[in-house]
Design a protein with these regions (language model features):
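Selective transmembrane helix interface/packing segments
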Residues: 1-246
């Protein structure tokens, strides 16, 4: 449907991803406007209340898993979580899900991967390079290979689960079409081919796009927070936590 968008050879999943980003941008603008005109003496309601609770939740979530030395890290985690969850449930519309396109999980995994090394270099300075020759210098090749483990883990885990659901849904859809054509072959029209499909496919879509999407989103942001939190010195995170509680 989207593959020839405006006569451009762009994969449908990429267009879906742009739509998801547009949805998030519109929601952000609406929340920003509501926050601007919100009376500080009154309790927020509706979308603004949801956004406020979301910010609190992801700030605490990031603090628990990644430490308290990065006060703004919860915003990154929240942004990734919102994008991923909407991207998963986007398949409920019948349009391509962005997560089933390898470039999308790879981009998310690469973002976390680069952030891991940026945080490590920021807090450890020149000692960052020492990690590649520990415990002995001849471990350099092994360490250079193992440094890619978080990128592969995050990308392949996310893409594998998304594409597995898509493959299963496709197989079930074709099987139900053939079964419907066989059972209702006496009905002279094409609609009999999808007669049995709506209810089973709706249930599977609800699982893979909604329930499984929530699980995969949670797993991805949890691993991202843990991987990044491992690069923050423990004493720095502890001192920040102590200062916050004073």
């Amino acid at each position: 449907m989207f593959d020839n968008f405006f006569s451009l050879d762009i994969p449908g999943e990429v267009i879906s991803s742009l739509i998801v980003i547009l949805i998030i941008m519109v929601l952000s603008i609406i929340i920003g406007i509501k926050a601007h005109f919100q009376d500080p003496l009154k309790r927020p309601r509706g979308l603004l209340l949801l956004a406020e609770e979301g910010v609190k939740f992801f700030d605490n979530f990031a603090g628990e898993l990644a430490g308290h030395a990065m006060p703004n890290f919860g915003g990154f985690i929240m942004g990734v979580a919102v994008y991923l969850f909407i991207a998963f449930i986007f398949g409920l519309t019948g349009l391509p899900s962005p997560v089933t396109y390898m470039a999308v999980p790879l981009s998310l995994g690469l973002t976390t991967f680069l952030l891991i090394h940026f945080i490590s270099a920021r807090f450890t300075k020149w000692k960052y390079f020492k990690r590649y020759v520990e415990p002995f210098p001849f471990f350099l090749p092994v360490n250079l290979i193992s440094m890619w483990a978080p990128l592969l883990s995050l990308t392949l885990r996310l893409f594998g689960n998304a594409i597995a659901g898509w493959v299963l849904l496709t197989i079930v859809e074709y099987a139900l079409r053939d079964l419907s054509a066989m059972v209702f072959s006496f009905i002279p029209s094409d609609w009999n081919q999808i007669f049995l499909a709506p209810i089973p496919l709706a249930i599977l879509h609800a699982y893979f796009d909604l329930f499984s999407g929530l699980i995969q989103t949670t797993v991805f942001i949890s691993l991202s927070a843990i991987f990044i939190g491992q690069e923050v010195p423990e004493e720095l995170s502890f001192n920040t936590l102590v200062n916050e509680r004073r």
